[in-house]
């Protein structure tokens, strides 16, 4: 891993629209279903189990939405160097009416980090994301060990406004953490052949009988996926968003 942790300004009190992730012991383990592996790309083996003592931190209750990202643009006038595919679903610099509360997509890691820095936050590490989604008991989904289509966006074939599935929270009440859109982490790798970041959670889109798309649908919280970083415009797509974390004093 060549890029993981960038400290944010720290606070004591839970910030607005974030939840407290208390300190605790956590067994970090990742697993990919061998049936979902792309035969053309050698995915790295992250199957080691590591016991970690997690510090207290804060995480966004929901993925960053279109309206939140619009506020960032209004206040900063941020424009990426490469605008290919940037906010592709928007028109004239704004999200379409009725989509304000959808997770923002068609942003790449640099776009997400720019937002996070403006907000006084940062992207989560893989370990932070999984601990916030899973807690300390190694459950497979935020709510337990069995998939439940009433608790997340399960094959609806479109993204949904954040907060729609209020019964699908994690042990710490982090919402929309599986399904809807993939979420970026700060973990970036270079294995000598590929430069990639790790995304988590799955998305609403579930391709059938195709090896050219990553596995879709809501996925277990211990499932990592590799997002190849090829070029800024190509690193943006319709099913990857992000949420932020903030350090605690």
Name every feature range the model reports, one short phrase each:
Residues 9, 231-232:
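Periodic aromatic/glycine/histidine/acidic cluster detector
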Residues 10-87, 107-110, 179:
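A short glycine-rich, aromatic-capped structural motif
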Residues 21, 27, 87-226, 233-238:
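Functional-site microenvironments in short loops/helix caps that host divalent-cation chemistry
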Residues 4-5:
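Intrinsically disordered, low-complexity PEST-like regions enriched in Ser/Thr and acidic residues
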Residues 64, 77, 136, 187-190, ...:
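Acidic glycine-/aspartate-rich tracts in secreted/extracellular proteins
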Residues 238-249:
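Short, structured beta-strand segments at or near domain termini in extracellular proteins/domains
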């Amino acid at each position: 891993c060549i890029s993981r942790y960038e400290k944010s300004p720290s606070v004591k009190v839970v910030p607005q629209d974030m939840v407290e992730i208390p300190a605790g012991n956590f067994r970090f383990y990742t697993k990919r279903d061998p049936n979902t592996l792309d035969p053309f790309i050698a995915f790295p083996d992250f199957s080691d189990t590591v016991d970690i003592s997690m510090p207290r931190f804060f995480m966004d209750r929901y993925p960053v939405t279109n309206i939140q990202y619009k506020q960032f643009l209004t206040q900063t006038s941020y424009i990426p160097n490469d605008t290919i595919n940037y906010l592709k679903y928007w028109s004239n610099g704004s999200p379409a009416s009725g989509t304000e509360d959808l997770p923002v997509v068609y942003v790449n890691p640099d776009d997400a980090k720019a937002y996070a820095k403006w907000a006084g936050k940062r992207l989560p590490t893989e370990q932070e994301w999984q601990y916030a989604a899973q807690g300390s008991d190694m459950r497979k989904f935020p709510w337990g060990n069995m998939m439940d289509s009433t608790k997340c966006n399960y094959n609806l074939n479109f993204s949904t406004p954040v907060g729609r599935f209020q019964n699908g929270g994690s042990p710490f009440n982090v919402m929309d953490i599986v399904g809807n859109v993939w979420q970026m982490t700060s973990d970036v790798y270079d294995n000598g052949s590929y430069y990639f970041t790790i995304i988590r959670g799955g998305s609403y889109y579930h391709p059938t009988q195709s090896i050219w798309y990553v596995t879709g649908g809501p996925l277990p919280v211990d499932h990592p996926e590799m997002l190849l970083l090829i070029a800024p415009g190509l690193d943006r797509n319709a099913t990857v968003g992000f949420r932020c974390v903030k350090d605690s004093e």
